[in-house]
């Protein structure tokens, strides 16, 4: 699987984080957003560094599988792009109206 950047992980957690166990979610949050190392998370949870690494890897895979099946983020981004195009078109319409009004005033 491809490596995810922080914004992608953030979206996955926002959309699907509640589908993970509390421990999985907390490990992801600690690692990616609280900037804790694997060793620090392991020490806080009294488990091995390898266990935390495996948990984070498994959790990311689960989040990606949720997205692959449900496509919530894909649909969200699609809607966002459509809204942006509508907004841009409305702005273009307003600019054209203003130009037409200016042309009528100058005649």
Swiss-Prot record:
Position of the signal peptide: none
Domain of life (superkingdom): Bacteria
Transmembrane segments: none
InterPro entries: RNA_pol_sigma_r3/r4-like, UPF0122, UPF0122_fam_protein, WH-like_DNA-bd_sf
Role noted for this protein: Might take part in the signal recognition particle (SRP) pathway. This is inferred from the conservation of its genetic proximity to ftsY/ffh. May be a regulatory protein.
Protein family (similarity comment): Belongs to the UPF0122 family.
HAMAP family (UniProt xref): UPF0122
PANTHER family xrefs: UPF0122 PROTEIN CBO2450/CLC_2298, UPF0122 PROTEIN YLXM
Name the UniProt record assigns to this protein: UPF0122 protein MYPE4850
């Amino acid at each position: 699987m491809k490596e995810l950047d922080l914004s992608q992980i953030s979206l996955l957690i926002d959309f699907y984080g509640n589908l993970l166990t509390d421990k999985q979610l907390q490990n992801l949050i600690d690692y990616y957003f609280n900037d804790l190392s694997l060793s620090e998370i392991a020490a806080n949870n009294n488990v091995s560094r390898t266990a935390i690494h495996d948990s984070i890897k498994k959790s990311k895979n689960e989040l990606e599988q949720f997205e692959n099946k449900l496509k919530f983020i894909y649909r969200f981004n699609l809607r966002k792009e459509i809204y942006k195009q509508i907004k841009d078109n409305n702005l273009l319409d307003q600019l054209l109206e203003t130009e037409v009004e200016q042309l009528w005033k100058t005649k």
